[in-house]
From Swiss-Prot:
Pathway: Carbohydrate degradation; 2-deoxy-D-ribose 1-phosphate degradation; D-glyceraldehyde 3-phosphate and acetaldehyde from 2-deoxy-alpha-D-ribose 1-phosphate: step 2/2
Signal peptide: none
Location within or outside the cell: Cytoplasm
Identification of the protein by name: Deoxyribose-phosphate aldolase
Keyword Lyase: yes
Keywords, comma-separated and alphabetical: Cytoplasm, Lyase, Schiff base
InterPro entries to which the protein is assigned, alphabetical: Aldolase_TIM, DeoC, DeoC/FbaB/LacD_aldolase, DeoC_typeI
Cysteine pairs bridged by disulfides in the record: none
Catalytic activity: 2-deoxy-D-ribose 5-phosphate = D-glyceraldehyde 3-phosphate + acetaldehyde
Enzyme class: lyase
Main subcellular localisation: cytoplasm
MF (Gene Ontology): deoxyribose-phosphate aldolase activity
Gene: deoC
Upper taxonomic lineage: Bacteria, Bacillati, Mycoplasmatota, Mycoplasmoidales, Metamycoplasmataceae
């Protein structure tokens, strides 16, 4: 498996500068990562720097809390696409989910998907803040929408993706819904394990060390 092409090489630190983004982009080019994941403010820059490459631009909406007004999320998504984003990773409104306002969640996701059309939409459910039962319910809920992916984590909570998270999501998702694992993925072993559990995209800021793990493993044979 060529893991490089299913990695979203990620830099979402609030202190990231344009120079940091340019370094991220050069790393993505060097290692042929499938995508970079950056804050919306840097999408225009990335579009310019990634001209004539196949590297996708992923950006985040309603990040990292998910509690913005839905109309703001929609506008943010629309502007991100206009600036050159290929994919949107939006954060679910976790408070609304906790109080079981499921129709609100469905409407918000579908409105954003309508806003971005054929572009890929991933919904972050922030598994760290959910019980196993809630992860199952959130997975079923996202499966009932027009979203393309369910994503485990923002990377800004107290933990990221876990093996248990992936197992629950896999058991409860629809056939059409893909899985992106993110948050705390720091080594090849985690990535390989999550891949076996059904994840087909990975968000990580530790991409370079993971690729080194992969190269070292290949050199052993």
């Amino acid at each position: 498996m060529n893991f490089n092409v299913i990695i979203d090489h990620t830099l979402l630190k609030p202190q990231a500068t344009s120079q940091d983004i340019k370094i991220l982009i050069e790393e993505a080019k060097k290692y042929n990562f499938g995508a970079i994941c950056i804050a919306p403010i840097w999408v225009k820059l990335a579009k310019k720097e990634l001209k004539n490459t196949n590297i996708k631009i992923v950006t985040v909406i309603g990040f990292p809390l998910g509690s913005q007004i839905s109309a703001i999320k929609q506008k943010e998504a629309s502007l991100a696409i206009a600036h050159g984003a290929d994919e949107i990773d939006m954060v679910m409104n976790i408070g609304k989910f906790k109080e079981k306002d499921f129709q609100f969640i469905i409407n918000e996701i579908n409105q954003i998907k309508k806003e971005i059309g054929a572009k890929i939409l991933k919904v972050i459910i922030e598994t760290a803040l959910l019980s196993p039962h809630e992860i199952a319910d959130a997975t079923k809920l996202v499966s009932s929408t027009n979203a393309d992916f369910i994503k485990t984590s923002t990377g800004f909570s107290y933990r990221g993706a876990s093996e248990q998270d992936l197992k629950i999501i896999k058991e409860n998702k629809s056939e059409k819904l893909a899985i992106k694992a993110a948050g705390g993925i720091t080594n090849l072993a985690d990535m390989e394990n999550f891949y076996r559990l059904g994840a087909t995209r990975f968000g990580t800021s530790k991409s370079l060390s993971i690729i080194k793990n992969l190269t070292d493993k290949k050199n052993q044979y």
